[in-house]
A protein has these predicted regions:
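Short beta-strand-centered aromatic/proline hotspots
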Residues: 27-36, 126-133
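Short glycine-rich, low-complexity segments
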Residues: 1-28, 47-124, 145-181
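Short, conserved beta-turn/loop elements at beta-strand boundaries and strand-helix junctions
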Residues: 37-42, 68-72, 134-139, 167-170
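N-terminal beta-strand/beta-hairpin edge segment
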Residues: 33-51
Length: 181
């Protein structure tokens, strides 16, 4: 979908859970509460088990469909729960970036831990850690594994291959809290 198409869909869905489909990348859809659509990215709160679990910045061109509760009865029920559980008060993302370049510049400054998804022709790779530098179109990351061990070498990520960045989620935030940086 284009940025304009996405803006049109989310325009009247203020603070509602929507189902976002990335047909080329994922068989599974995501439940998200969109915050804004920028030039290249959709920024949204991530919904998991009736709770907000961080934020996602998704490259718009990979979004193939956005489904609202008008087309999906289950989403209507989820939005009812979302409202009754008072989840609408979850703070907006502090990053208001419409491109991955701008987002990564902010992440270098903040030192926040993130999960970066890169979409290659034959595979999808995930890198979890902190963005430590941005030079041209290459971001440098200090990554860690599921055992909390830092990678010996830093990882270089080409922004052209980044399809999504997740931050503020419980897994990444909790792991990063206990890593010996």
């Amino acid at each position: 979908m284009t940025a304009k198409e996405i803006q049109k869909v989310i325009k009247n869905q203020n603070n509602k859970i929507l189902e976002v489909v990335r047909g080329e990348i994922d068989e599974m859809s995501m439940l998200l509460v969109p915050q804004f659509q920028g030039a290249e990215l959709l920024c949204a709160k991530s919904v998991s088990d009736f709770a907000i679990d961080g934020y996602r910045f998704i490259r718009s061109k990979f979004i193939s469909e956005i489904i609202s509760d008008e087309k999906n009865e289950t989403l209507s029920f989820y939005n009812h729960i979302y409202e009754k559980e008072n989840l609408k008060n979850f703070p907006d993302c502090k990053y208001n970036c419409d491109t991955f370049r701008k987002l990564f510049e902010e992440l270098v400054k903040s030192g926040d831990a993130v999960t970066v998804e890169c979409n290659f022709e034959e595979a999808i790779d995930y890198y979890v850690g902190k963005i430590t530098d941005l030079t041209g179109n290459l971001a440098t990351m200090q990554c860690f594994d599921g055992s909390g061990i830092l990678f010996k070498d830093k990882v270089r990520v080409n922004l052209d291959f980044v399809s999504m960045v997740s931050l503020g989620d419980r897994y990444t935030s909790t792991m990063a809290k206990y890593i010996k940086w």
